[in-house]
Amino acid sequence: MKISNPIFDEWGVIRDAHKNLPSDDLKVAFLAALEELEDNECHRTRKFPRTRLHKVVGYKEPVYRADVDKISGWRIHLQYDGGQIHLKDLIEGQKHDEVLEQIKAKKERYEKQAPAKSKSGNSAR
């Protein structure tokens, strides 16, 4: 039985891929990339032959990028939180070299949110 890591898509990255990837071949490659990212064995061995998953250098929060297709340049940005994978963005082929600019343009997706403070009996009178 294959063990998988769940993928969370709070930002609609899967929907964006379906809408914006220009060919059926890239849509299939996107699904194959998600399959590899879910594969616990790839995480255990830290080998991602299809997506070449790697950490983005130069941003304060840990952000990772994975290839949808190396030739076309389409990339998936993701982060780990509590051992879970959270999809953050789908990067268009022509823009994949501008990685930090792409992250900064949507920085609210990448910044860790501080836990909400409890309202238990601490109200001002």
Q: What are these model-predicted stretches?
A:
Residues M1-W74, Y80-R125:
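Basic, Lys/Arg-enriched alpha-helical interface segments
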